[in-house]
Amino acid sequence: MENREPAVLVEGLYKAYGDTRALDGLDMTVERGTVHAILGPNGAGKTTLVRTLATLLRVQRGRVEVDGIDVAARPRDVRRRIGLLGQHAALDEELSGRQNLELFGRLHHLGGRRAAARAGELLERFGLADTGKRPVSGYSGGMRRRLDLAASLIVDPAVLFLDEPTTGLDPRGRTEVWESVRSLVGAGTTVLLTTQYLEEADQLADLISVVDGGRVIAEGTADRLKGLVGGDRLDVVVANPGRLAEAAAVLGRLFGGSGAFDLDQLVKFDQSPGEGERPRRISLPVADRRGALARAVRALDAEGIEAEDLAVRRPTLDEVFLRLTGSPAESPADAAGAPAPPAAGVPAAPGTT
């Protein structure tokens, strides 16, 4: 019979370091077989939440269950059902990929034969079978992260916590990890992901929770969150910056009815102009994207205004994040004072239960 209870349930979770509230009555539900992403600015409480769920920090106040088990009452049972991948690879550079996985297996009391068999399964699963005998020191960043991910799965966890899993990787390495995460979820694993890359949440997450001040301030699919900051927008780059205000008035009348837009609100400063150059890009909301480009081109042409580029786009998660939290997502750090996580796949140290 299918288990209908959530993979992770958090109600009223509170955690403080002295006078600093890292988590302040946080509520969250993670459904089984999904990727649930957590976004938040530096110090929002993301890593504190993950460490609490993974039994690395005690529950001060609130209800926390993982795979139906109370984290505060039965932390050892929780550890048997979870995997944790921290922000930094936890691998022995001098050992081979296979030796690393077998080591993690023995640390989890699998025994020699079971550890060797599981290592072989995971190397094959993550496309590392051909390089399993090579020292990890010769692995690329993406290969190391995939091996680290494999290590976190040594006990075949029901729930996997990924804390900034692709920090420091190049685009190719990130893509490799994304593909691995998708395959895990396809096989039934539940993934709770914290990330500083909004594209990562957009690519992977079934549901996204935006955390700020130790609370969930918004939650939904990527499309729903984008809808919170408005609908489609028309971006226009004019060839002559001296006609920017005129272009804004023309497009304002076309899409806004009166043209009574505040130019400062429409101007989007381009990242490409050199120092001292005037802005040439404007962005304004459009109620209906159908035919918007053609209408804009005709209106600008009628006034003799040349546009170098026009595009209709959806809001980005970056804009959602900035609107909701007032700060950009740029730092992988979290609330100060929380202890560092252990190596991937390694049981929590004594004293954390």
For the regions a language model picked out, list residue spans one by one.
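Conserved short beta-strand edge segments in small beta-sheet-based binding/regulatory domains
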Residues: 306-313
